[in-house]
Amino acid sequence: MPKTVVIPPGTGKPLAPYVPGTLADGVLYVSGTLPLDAEANVVHEGDAGAQTRHVLETIKGVVEAAGGSMDDVTFNHIFLKDWADYGAINAVYATYFPGEKPARYCIQCGLVKPTALVEIASVAHIGKPA
């Protein structure tokens, strides 16, 4: 099955051998997204809400570059560093999915960047029914 690599304009260099998104048969897989600037520095250190907003804006950019919208997101994998940030993450998350919510799971774990508080990976169905 052919696949299309999705790299939005202005995307920084990844931390490992991956791309921001891959589109195959109308399904977009968005890589785990950390709150990083173009030089791979963590932004908004200590602020889980602001980091979540940055991550979701980055994901939104990948989805839009593939021709979709956040309404096309059907599943999110959320990784958080500390359960104490769960409420702040959810408050911001809810603003990006005001209607029907995508399925998701959330786990607490260590993240590749020590000052990152959240990482999200997504799946979206673009151009075809989910």
From Swiss-Prot:
Enzyme kind, highest EC tier: hydrolase
Cell division among keywords: no
Record field: catalytic activity: (Z)-3-aminoacrylate + H2O + H(+) = 3-oxopropanoate + NH4(+)
Molecular function terms from GO: deaminase activity
Keywords annotated in UniProt: Hydrolase
Domain of life: Bacteria
Gene3D superfamilies in the cross-refs: RutC-like
GO cellular component: cytosol
Family designation: Belongs to the RutC family.
Listed name of the protein: 3-aminoacrylate deaminase RutC
